[in-house]
Amino acid sequence: GIAGALLLLVVGSLAVAYGPLFSVKQITIIGTSNLDRGEVESALEAQRGVPLAFVDDKTVQASLAKFPLIESYSLEARPPHELVVRIVERTPIGVIESASGFTLVDAAGVVLSTSSQRPAGRPLIVTAGDAASPEFIAIGRAIRSLPEDFRARVDRVTATSAHDISFVLDSGLEAFWGSAEESALKSLVLTQTVAKLPNARHIDVSAPGAVVIS
């Protein structure tokens, strides 16, 4: 009867949804720039053949835990066979020098890598505070406000408090930033000033409405 037909329809639908017809055959990684997309895909190899409806977030999380550069991710099932993994990478702000070498960190102080040689294009962070200190947090906000290409020109950033951040560019130019307040405006003012006055040796943008140049 009708009830039997409906039951068969439901059972058939479940069999299709949870069976091999809707299993993972393609894994698409989106959002990687510093990470090797192939390595991330390989780490999720165990998901191939798993029905899309049975892809377990905790299993995926465990597979991605070995990539410290991943800040967050999301999963999207695209029937019949595609699993899309959207990655949000951590933004490195610079390196901290220690006896073990040069440690690349993000704005939260998460260690992304350690190497014996200083990575190119990464500013050296000089501060006595740890990752939870006001000065480190302020440094992170200031560096992240800079355009990526300009950030690569920063050789060193120092701060003894949250109110005396200073940058030294690879050209030797010194820029006094002050606090992390108005960082977006300070970033705009600094980059424009450096572009207009490439021979300046010192730029104070702590009060972005009244820049001091020498």
Task: Report each predicted region and the residues it spans.
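Periplasmic polypeptide-binding modules associated with outer-membrane biogenesis and secretion
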Residues: 6-35, 42, 51-101
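Extracytoplasmic/secreted envelope proteins and their assembly/folding machinery
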Residues: 37, 41, 57, 61, ...
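Solvent-exposed, non-transmembrane alpha-helical starts
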Residues: 52-53, 94-97, 132-137, 176-179, ...
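Envelope-exposed proteins and targeting segments
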Residues: 23-25, 36, 56, 60, ...
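Extracytoplasmic/luminal low-complexity segments enriched in Pro/Gly and acidic/polar residues
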Residues: 180-214
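Extracytoplasmic segments of membrane-associated envelope/inner-membrane machinery
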Residues: 88-161
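N-terminal export and membrane-targeting signals
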Residues: 1-5
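Flexible glycine-/small-residue-rich
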Residues: 31-33, 87-91, 169-171, 179, ...
